[in-house]
Amino acid sequence: MARLTRLLPLAALVLSACSITPPKGPGKSPDAPQWRQHQQEVRNLSQYQTRGAFAYLSDQQKVYARFFWQQTGQDRYRLLLLNPLGSTELELKAQPGEAQITDNKGQQYTGTDAEEMIGKLTGMPIPINSLRQWILGLPGDATDYKLDDQYRLSQMNYSQNGKTWKVIYGGYDSATKPALPSSMELTEGGQRIKLKMDNWIVK
């Protein structure tokens, strides 16, 4: 599979080199009932989709793309990475126990671990298994996190397999109920992943 460095337009100015900074001021307690209620409302979402801009930045490669994320059921989701012309560079379909990736040449790969497959095929170690929760503003398995003044996830640290990811949320889309993230940044060592969500559709 040709690595996704072809996706690299400098047109992705929406994801500039500047970093997201967490909101200033005191956050709310993770023990607050408002936070528990928000988490439950998000978990109750059975289907949702979002699209936006994606960037992966490291010393080895810089990748910019459009993305489309669709959750169709419990542990069933689809991820598309698109080039600036709108053509699909990578499609991931996942369901319990099975993941399938199709590259830009139509070659298909199947396996059981979507995260491992994406890392091997693209050279981008995206923590997709955790990102499924993080993109919704849920901590997943992370226990080291902070809330903003609206009882929503503000930032967190998550360590697994010798890596520690730091996640910072740049804002939330209050037009959706419950409010869902509008931008986020993940950093680990010398690599950075940035996501900017244009909009959300929830059911």
UniProtKB/Swiss-Prot annotation:
Keyword Calcium on entry: no
Gene Ontology biological process terms from the UniProt entry: lipoprotein localization to outer membrane; protein transport
UniProt keyword Ion transport, yes or no: no
Signal sequence coordinates: 1-17
GO cellular component: cell outer membrane
SUPFAM superfamilies xrefs: Prokaryotic lipoproteins and lipoprotein localization factors (SSF89392)
Keywords: Cell outer membrane, Chaperone, Lipoprotein, Membrane, Palmitate, Protein transport, Signal, Transport
Entry membrane topology: Lipid-anchor
Subcellular localization, as worded in the UniProt entry: Cell outer membrane
Family per record: Belongs to the LolB family.
Function: Plays a critical role in the incorporation of lipoproteins in the outer membrane after they are released by the LolA protein.
HAMAP family (UniProt xref): LolB (MF_00233)
UniProt xrefs under NCBIfam families: lolB
Name this protein carries in UniProt: Outer-membrane lipoprotein LolB
Species per Swiss-Prot/TrEMBL record: Enterobacter sp. (strain 638)
Organism phylogeny: Bacteria, Pseudomonadati, Pseudomonadota, Gammaproteobacteria, Enterobacterales
Gene: lolB
